[in-house]
Regions:
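Acidic, polar-rich low-complexity tracts and alpha-helical solenoid repeat scaffolds
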Residues: 1-171
Length: 171
């Protein structure tokens, strides 16, 4: 439909010009107007995705996460946009050192992509490398908790284990 061409043209116009050169006030005003227009409802995923890219490039990570999730909730069926949202969220969590969460988002990305594509192989390799990081991070966290218990005084250690036993009994 012609509306689809208009939306994609407006969305990609900012991508091509580069978000760094964009006047943020005018950009946000324009995008909010596009988001509020009822005729654009079938394209909310693309609009939220591009708004998330804008926030991501401008280091507003919290806003970027919200917009990526809004794009995912729009559910319009554009597989590549869905995969791109998951991949970008995975990269955000990876950069925040939240490797387990990043792994989950990479898994969701792989589900959306065709297995014979270059992007699929790249993300699959990245995900496999992340498995070792997640494994060693779990070991380090467990060892840190053991060391912290060992560093407690006898009184604190007894109180800690009594509290833990009560917690297990409740379950």
């Amino acid at each position: 439909s012609p509306r689809a061409y208009i939306i994609h043209a407006k969305a990609n116009q900012e991508l091509l010009s580069g978000f760094e050169k964009t006047d943020s006030v005018n950009f946000l005003k324009k995008y909010n107007k596009l988001l509020k227009d009822r005729e654009n409802r079938p394209f909310l995923d693309v609009l939220h995705h591009n708004l998330a890219l804008y926030y991501d490039k401008n280091k507003k990570i919290g806003s970027a996460k919200k917009e990526y999730n809004k794009s995912l909730k729009a559910k319009t069926g554009d597989i590549y946009t869905i995969a791109s949202n998951y991949r970008n969220l995975a990269d955000i969590y990876f950069n925040e050192n939240k490797y387990q969460m990043a792994g989950k988002y990479f898994d969701s990305t792989l589900v959306q992509l065709k297995p014979r594509t270059r992007e699929f192989r790249f993300i699959k390799k990245k995900r496999e490398n992340l498995d070792d990081v997640i494994k060693y991070e779990g070991i380090a966290n467990r060892n840190d908790s053991i060391i912290s218990v060992y560093g407690m005084s006898n009184f604190d250690r007894i109180a800690y284990f009594e509290k833990y036993i009560l917690q297990l009994k409740k379950e």
